[in-house]
A protein has these predicted regions:
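Short, hydrophobic-biased segments on the C-terminal half of alpha helices
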Residues: 42-43
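Basic, amphipathic "hinge/linker" alpha-helix immediately C-terminal to the N-terminal HTH DNA-binding motif
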Residues: 57-76
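Single conserved hydrophobic/aromatic residue that forms the stacking wall/gate
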Residues: 174-181
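Key DNA-contact positions within bacterial/archaeal DNA-binding proteins
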Residues: 36
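N-terminal helix-turn-helix DNA-binding core of bacterial DNA-binding proteins
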Residues: 2-33
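C-terminal regulatory/oligomerization modules of transcriptional regulators
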Residues: 103-162
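A short, conserved structural fragment
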Residues: 48-54
């Protein structure tokens, strides 16, 4: 599979977490490509069994597509953990490097990397790392806005805003802050 197809699968996967059908416009905006390019790639992905496309409604990932996208997120997350924990990259630097490395990673390399890292459950910013089959645990975290004055909490996940991530300490683990009134 080409890295371009993999990027589309990842984008569809991300957008479909909010709603099942993903429009070509959403993909065009996210990937910064023209609408005709999106249409062409969606047809290729449908032909290969990764998405089901309904005209004027959008694309929906098939089980095969979701599994493949989950593997890509696994590869990406494992590389982020390695780059942050072992090579001391910032979150944004690790993300950028992992974007390239994920496309070059085999299942065997990912398995060995996972073992070397001690089977991490979360990437550096707190998202669960998918299992080898591409499946992923759901998130059950509360947002900071759910807290009441005087509460304290442990931040376990940071939404991928790299300007914010570079401002915060590299490891999200056990970063405990009092509620700010």
């Amino acid at each position: 599979m080409t890295s371009g197809k993999e990027d589309y699968l990842k984008a569809i996967y991300i957008i479909s977490e909010d709603h099942e059908l993903v429009s070509n416009k959403e993909l065009s905006d996210m990937l910064h490509v023209s609408p005709p390019s999106v249409s062409e790639m969606i047809m290729k992905l449908q032909k290969e069994g990764y998405v089901d496309y309904t005209a004027y409604k959008g694309s929906k990932m098939t089980r095969k597509g979701r599994r493949e996208a989950g593997k890509l997120f696994r590869f990406h997350a494992l590389w982020e953990v390695f780059l942050v924990e072992k090579l001391h990259f910032s979150w944004s630097e690790a993300h950028e490097q992992a974007d390239g490395l994920e496309h070059q990673t085999s299942d065997m390399l990912a398995e060995r990397l996972d073992e070397f890292l001690g089977h991490p459950e979360h990437c550096p910013h707190g998202d669960p790392i998918p299992k080898a089959d591409g499946s992923r645990k759901g998130l059950t975290f509360r947002t900071l806005s759910d807290l009441k004055e005087g509460d304290s909490t442990t931040i376990r996940r940071i939404v991928e805003d790299y300007s914010l991530m570079d401002y915060l300490p590299v490891s999200y683990t056990h970063l405990t802050l009092p509620t700010i009134a």
